[in-house]
């Protein structure tokens, strides 16, 4: 539906969705927020292989390098300034200086501050 709307830009979610945003000679995807899972999957598979896997619910965060966004030239339509600001915010998330609202940490949209 977004492709059919005129002048619309979107941000993809979970994986790089740039290819999905192709719309004639333009693209509606500015960037995509990513779940970065390759390291986690690799580590868990090694735990299974060596017998140390203990199974548990784990919440991965920026501090685990489990989140990110597409900034690769040609797949991202953000300005250099926007990318710099997102990188700065990502660093604050990793340091715990920004704690986003979530259903597991008691922070709500109403109580969120930074």
Regions found by a protein language model. Give the residues of each.
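A residue-level marker of the well-folded mature domains of exported/periplasmic proteins
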Residues: 1-114
């Amino acid at each position: 539906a977004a492709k059919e709307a005129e002048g619309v830009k979107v941000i993809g979610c979970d994986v790089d969705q740039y290819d999905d945003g192709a719309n004639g000679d333009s693209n509606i995807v500015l960037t995509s927020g990513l779940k970065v899972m390759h390291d986690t999957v690799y580590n868990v598979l090694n735990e299974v292989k060596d017998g140390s896997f203990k199974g548990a619910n784990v919440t991965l965060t920026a501090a685990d390098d489990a989140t990110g966004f597409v900034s690769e030239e040609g797949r991202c339509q953000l300005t250099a300034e926007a990318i710099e600001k997102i990188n700065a915010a990502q660093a604050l998330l990793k340091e715990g200086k920004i704690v986003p609202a979530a259903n597991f940490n008691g922070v709500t949209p109403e109580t969120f501050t930074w």
